[in-house]
Amino acid sequence: ESRNIRLQEVMALIEELVAQIPMAEKLLEIKGVGIRTVSGFLAEVGDISRFNNPKELQKLAGLALVENSSGKHKGETTISRRGRKRLRYLLFEVAMSLVAKNPEFRELHVYYTTRRLNPLKKMQSLMAVAAKLLRIFYVMLTKSVDYDPKM
């Protein structure tokens, strides 16, 4: 019981701290994104203004695309995985939540997996959705705009 009480105290403290961050409440308006996602994202990324573009943020998360090629061999394109593992895991978890709860992201996932040209496997699609969410977070935090599903 004392562990549950301590956990509730820590979560209350996290909610207080997130409430102090400008634009954090805007991120919570996205259906499927919760306080743990926002607090984890902000803790891992830090000051968003140090990034010049969303590609730098994708690289930090290890979601940058790299091609496995050498000489005449052209291999598959995969994510680099050379970033922060916890941030990538957090984004993957929220991508699953978004695909389940948010109609815009579900539609995007269905499109990625069923498109005629280069359909993605389910895991690849979830990583693409995670990268999309990362770009949305970047735009919302740097430009101080509200969430627009057409973003």
Over which residues does each language-model region extend?
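A detector of single, family-specific signature residues
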Residues: 1-151
